[in-house]
Design a protein with these regions (language model features):
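N-terminal amphipathic/hydrophobic interface segments
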Residues: 7-454
């Protein structure tokens, strides 16, 4: 072996070379080596040919390059190595192997001192969990973290992710995804979109900037799927044991086939199937609108079982035949449902009622207006069939032209604000991640892989 003091205070050792030529290139002394194996400290590399620039700390290598260090193995087509900086400019078919991770790129600047790799032209990361690709990226080996920019895609057995840029710490499983993002979560049967996402190993996901969550739940009793759409400025999903929680903030809109709502804040518990709405909320179920400072929506097997609101709620039911608006208000209101239809409303204390009546021909025929400490209304298939009022003070209003416009104090009816079912399904914007590697694998990489398989 020949030691050559070509790198300042360090030495490059020529362990093997079929041919050694000393020459001058552009006035610089160069040693040209063919079928070379060189080492410097714990850095060892092989190539078809290598040029040692004897007057400066550089080695240029060409063809079938393999670099071995205690922490990584690298393959490339060409290499410029700056010894003092411990920096390599790797070009061509570049593969970096670190533990169970493989990184692929076409143009990579890798620093052996800091263990940081800059992937300038495409990056593909493969590990036991899945595959991640992007237009460019930076990989930090010591912290096992990475930044990816441009057309970022991640796919594993549980999810598919797209975005403009991504930061991920693989050790802590913390990630931040930015701009034009979509997450398809096959484990939880959910889809998320927005412009910023945080996620960690606890299952927490925080979504903001045009946040959207679509959740599909299958009814265990009927096997029918119910889809819930939630929009908001911010949405946070967390999990504790088998219970999932949803917290949404800022202009929160919900649509499902069972109910829809509008609020400043929403909280949901999957075990209790309870939605809690805060901040001047409104909730709709079929032809009923409920408004109040606080509303809870209790589901059972994904069907609305109960709506509760306090203090000072106001409920409106639109008659499906006449279009007239039945109204009820008070301090607390509870509405109960059976098989999706309203079956009973309790309102107490200080209840007030305006209910429009119909004749046998289903034509408008006056109205009942009353006040009572407590009112209970009973319905059959959505139609009022009986009313109970304690200490009732009321009157019957005969039919007249303006009766349809009569309103109780505090009247709220805003059907134009009711969220509607989204008409466009969010879809990935990028083609699927290819199962194939981005280039034909270098010969030394293939040979090494074949040996390990034997």
């Amino acid at each position: 072996m020949l030691s050559v003091p070509a790198f300042g205070q360090t030495k490059v050792t020529i362990e093997k070379a079929e041919i050694v030529n000393n020459t001058t290139v552009d006035g610089e002394r160069v040693r040209k080596l063919y079928d070379a194996v060189l080492s410097s400290g714990d850095f060892r590399f092989m190539s078809d040919s290598a040029w040692q620039f004897l007057d400066k700390d550089e080695v240029h290598a060409f063809g079938n390059i393999q670099i071995d260090t205690p922490t990584e193995r690298i393959w490339a087509d060409t290499l410029i190595y700056y010894n003092i900086l411990e920096l390599s400019k790797l070009r061509g078919r570049v593969i970096i192997e670190q533990d169970s991770t493989l990184l692929f790129g076409n143009s990579v600047d890798y620093n052996f001192a800091t263990k940081v790799g800059h992937f300038l032209d495409e990056i593909r990361l493969e590990d036991t969990d899945g595959i991640l690709v992007a237009d460019s990226g930076i990989y930090y080996q010591n912290s096992d973290s990475a930044e990816f920019r441009g057309n970022v895609q991640l796919a594993d057995s549980a999810q598919y992710v797209e975005g403009d840029s991504l930061f991920i710490n693989r050790e802590t499983k913390f990630l931040r995804l930015f701009d034009n993002l979509i997450v398809i979560d096959s484990t939880n049967n959910a889809l998320l979109t927005g412009h910023y996402l945080e996620a960690d190993s606890t299952g927490r996901r925080y979504l903001s900037d045009d946040a959207y969550l679509r959740s599909i739940v299958t009814d265990s009793t009927t096997t029918e799927a119910d889809t819930t759409h939630i929009f908001g400025d911010e949405i946070e999903l967390t999990k504790q044991d088998t219970t999932s929680f949803i917290d949404a903030m800022g202009n929160v809109r919900v649509w499902s086939s069972k109910f829809s709502s509008l609020s400043d804040t929403l909280k949901y518990n999957s075990t209790t199937e309870l939605f809690r709405l805060y901040g001047d909320p409104k909730a709709w179920h079929n032809n009923i609108q409920l408004s109040g400072p606080f509303i809870s929506v209790q589901l059972k097997d994904n069907n609305v079982e109960n709506l509760t609101s306090y203090p000072s709620p106001f409920a409106v039911q639109e008659d499906t035949v006449t279009g007239r608006l039945n109204q009820i208000k008070g301090d607390t209101l509870s509405a109960y449902f059976t098989d999706g239809d309203i079956s009973k409303i309790d309102i107490y204390p200080n209840s007030e009622l305006l209910y429009h009546t119909k004749n046998d021909a289903n034509e408008p025929d006056g109205a009942v207006e009353s006040s009572s400490p407590k009112t209970i209304l009973y319905f059959d298939k959505g139609e009022l069939v009986r009313a109970w009022m304690g200490q009732n003070q009321g009157l019957f209003l005969p039919e007249y032209t303006e009766l349809s416009e009569r309103k109780l104090a505090g009247f709220i009816w805003t059907p134009e604000l009711r969220p509607i079912k989204p008409t466009r399904e969010p879809l990935p914007q990028l083609p699927p991640i290819s199962a194939d590697r981005p280039f034909e694998l270098p010969l030394r990489f293939v040979n090494r892989t074949n040996v390990e398989r034997q």
